[in-house]
C-alpha cells in the first residue's frame, strides 16, 4: 500500500533540510528564554540579590561541566567499543542513536522551558532548579545536533550546506522574539505565560515529528539502496565494519584528556572560542543597557525594541551570506576577516566618540550581529577538529559529541563571566552598581538588578555613567579582537593541513560517513 502524498512528500525532503529544521524548535524557545528569564525572576517573582547570585554561581558550574559529562556518557563507547557478541556500532547506528536522543530530549527541553513562567516554588529555589534543568536538556539537544553535523557529512562543502539550513531555520525561530513583545506584560503575566505554552507545545511536537522523519529517511535509504546512508555524490556505499574488535582497548577519561592536551589546534581553538563566547554574551547582556544610556535621548522605545529584536534575527541571515564565502575561501579566512572587521569598527567608533547617534546605533547593532554570526561559523571548525582528533588518535569512530562537550567545558565559563566582569568594570569605572541603582525606562528586558531600587543617581553622575558605557562598548571588542587574532594565527587546521586530514579520515573510515540528499 502506497504512502499518501503528504507523507511521501515529507520523506522526499532532503536530509539537510530536515536536519536544519531541528534548529527552529530550539531557537523559538531559547531566544525568548535569553530575553526574559532574568526580568521574570527580578521584576515578577521578586528574587533577592543573594538568591540571584547563588543561582548564577551554581549555574556557572553546572553549565561548564554538563557538556563534557553528557558528551562522555554519549560517546565513550566510540572511543573504545565494548562489543556484545562481536557486534559493534556502525556509522548508521551512531547517527540513529543521536536522532533518537534528540527525539527524547527535545520535548523535555520544551517542558523545562515552561517551568520558568509559572511560580511553583520560592523564587530563589525555582531560579536555581529551572536554570539547571533547562540548561541540562539544552546541552543534550545541542550536543547531539552539533555531533550530527560531523557524522552526516565529511567535506567542508557539505557541512556548510547543512549549516546553511540551520541558519535559515534559526532565523525563522528568532521571529518569536518579535511576537513576544505583543504578550510581555509584567503586571498581567497570564498572556505571556499562554504564549510560552504555545511555543513549548510547538517545539516539543516539532522535535517528535522531525526526529521520526529523519529516522525513517535514514532507514528507508538503507532499505532502498542497501547501504547505511546516502553518498554525497550519489554513489552507493557499503556497510562498514562495526566499531570494536580485538584491537580496541579501553580508553579512560584521563587518557582521553591527555590526548586532548597534545592536540595543539584544539588548545588554540578553545582559547580563541573562550573569548568569543565571552564577547557574545557580553553583547547580549549589555545591549539594552547601551541602548538606554547611549541612545535613549535619540531613539524611541519602539526603535530600541526593534533593534533588540533584529539583533537576534540578523546573525542567522548574515550567515546565509558568510557560509557561501566559507565554501569559497574556507572558514579560517572568513573568521579571521570578521575579527579584523570587529577591530576596525571598534577603533573607528573610539575615534568618533559617543556623540554620533547614527554611528552608535550602527555599531551597537553590527557588533552584536557579527559577533553572534562568528559564533555560529565556529561550529564548522569544531567538526574539523573532530576529524583531526580521529586521525591523530586512530579512532574507529569520531567521538563528535564528546569533543563538542570538551570545547564547551573550556569556553562556557565565558557565558557567566560576561555579566560579572561587565558589571564589575562599570562599577569600578563609574561607581554605578546595577544592583543598587534605579532602572530607567527599559529598552529591552535584560535587567540583573533586584526589586528594591535605590534613589536615582544625581544628575552630575549621568555623564560619567554614559562615558563608562561608551568605553565599555568599544574597549571590550578591541581587547577581544586582539586576543583572538593572536590565538587564531596559531591555529593550523586550514588549507593544506585540513585537506590532508580530510583525506586521511576518508582512508581510516573507509568513506563510511552518511550522505546528505542535497537540494
UniProtKB/Swiss-Prot annotation:
Pfam families documented for this protein: MFS_2
Main localisation: membrane
Keywords: Cell membrane, Glycoprotein, Membrane, Transmembrane, Transmembrane helix
Record's bilayer topology term: Multi-pass membrane protein
Transmembrane segments: 12-43, 56-74, 101-118, 127-151, 156-179, 192-223, 265-292, 306-325, 331-350, 359-393, 403-429, 469-487
Location(s) in or outside the cell: Cell membrane
Record SUPFAM superfamilies: MFS general substrate transporter
Glycosylation site residues: 250
Keyword flag Ligase: no
Ranges per topology, Extracellular: 1-11, 75-100, 152-155, 224-264, 326-330, 394-402, 488-519
Cytoplasmic topological domain residue ranges: 44-55, 119-126, 180-191, 293-305, 351-358, 430-468
InterPro entries hit by this protein: MFS_trans_sf, TMEM180
GO CC, alphabetical: plasma membrane
Protein origin, superkingdom: Eukaryota
Protein name: Transmembrane protein 180
Chain's gene name: Mfsd13a
